[in-house]
Every structure is written in structure tokens, then in C-alpha cells.
């Protein structure tokens, strides 16, 4: 079910987002977002004074905006997503047009019933945190949230097993124009020099293969994912005599999204945004529990 308003969620598309899991926030309230923005702004200014996030040259102010995104959730049970944006503006300029967005962070929960049903009333469940921008800002914002809401953040890596699921799921999605190749990147670590192998598959061929493997449309099993990957491996071996099963899958790129094992994601299709976020919410929850 894709119910996110494309206009309200367009900011997520075609950018690289780093993924984190976040434990539930204690006594967080949607009614106090403006106060949170003020407090976070003061905290960043204090950290800047300590020299932790100094911009060289012009004296720059950091403007903090904290807003709610009710469109970005899977069901009524989910907490509305929270967007934190940091913009830089020269302290000599008062024009809004001269503000430059330098960092965004989005807390969200898409079909996170597994966790939200189990947590006490004073806690807010937003287990997935996406960031775009300098890590120095991520760490300052993260430490303010940790101090204020007694939560903890961890980088969310994506295992080769989960990447293979993404490859299969996204390959099977219907897209108006199949122009983007499905690309899998494998890492060979046993060599003196690390080597990456890129395996590009024509999107129509990849979809045709998945359609022969998938037994029940709309449902995916581990066995189907294994068969899909094995078919790709044996095809590659036939042509290049390389056993991809002995390497590590590190990146998947499709028309829907691309994902890297280090926990980096890029969303490419607004119509599948909710579906991808649902999968990432599930990974974040399993990371916390």
C-alpha cells in the first residue's frame, strides 16, 4: 500500500541516505517540535563554540527546522515521521533565499507494529533514522536526541542476505520504463588487493527470470530468493568462470532503489518509497531487539 504523498516525500528521492537504528524516544511529543528546534539550535551553537563544527570564513548561523511528516508512515498505528533540517545562513543576511540546506535527518516508522505494540506509553517508536549531509552534524544532532530522549543510535548495516532479498523484490516491481540495469556489486576479499566485481543484468531479463522463479505474486520466500541468485550466479560462471557464491554481495542497484552493505540507500521511485521504508523499518527493529 503506497500512501505517501509524492510531493511531501520528494525530498527523499535521488539522494544518498545513511541508515541508523534508534531505540524508542522517551517523552517525545509532536506538540513541542518548535521548542525542540530552538533547543537543538542552542545546542549546535554551543558545540560550534567548542570548535566541533566550525565553518571557516564568514560567520554563519545554523537554522534548525523540526517538522512532522504524517504522510510518511505505513498505518495509523505508526508515529508520523519527524524531519530535522539544518540550514546555513550568513549572519549578515536576513533573506530566507540565502539559506542553504546542509543536513537533513528523518526519523520514521513504516509498518513498525512489531515494536510499537510492545513499548510503554511514554515512549515513541521511530526506529529508522536516515541522514543526508556531513557526519559532524549527524553526530551533534544524534547526541542532542540521545541526551534529551534517552535513546541510542547505531549505524544500520545491510547484510548480503538482505541485499539479495532487495535485489529479488525490486527486480519484481513494475516500473513504467525499464531503463535502469539491475546491477549487483560483489567484493572479493581474499586477494592481496581488494577487488569489486560489477554484474549488470538487463532489467527485462532480470524481471523475466524473477517471474519464472516466483510462485505466488505478491509473496516472496527465502527459497525463491536463493533460486533467483543461484540462477544469476550460474549464468555468470558460464560466461566468466568465476564463482560469485564465494564472494560477498555489497551493493544492489535497480530502478526502484540502490542499497550498499555499509547502510547507504538511495530511493529512486516515489511509488515504491513506502515499500522500501517498510523493509528498512523491519531491519532497524531487528537491529534494536
For the regions a language model picked out, list residue spans one by one.
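Internal, hydrophobic cores of structured domains that mediate oligomerization or house catalytic pockets
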Residues: 88-170
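N-terminal low-complexity/intrinsically disordered pre-sequences and tails
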Residues: 1-117, 264-289
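Terminal interaction module
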Residues: 150-251
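C-terminal, charged interaction/regulatory segments at domain termini
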Residues: 225-289
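Amphipathic alpha-helical protein-protein interaction segments
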Residues: 124, 130, 134-135, 199, ...
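Charged, low-complexity surface segments at secondary-structure and domain boundaries
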Residues: 17-30, 126, 149-151, 213-216
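Core residues of folded domains in eukaryotic genome-function proteins
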Residues: 58-62, 78-84, 103-104, 124-129, ...
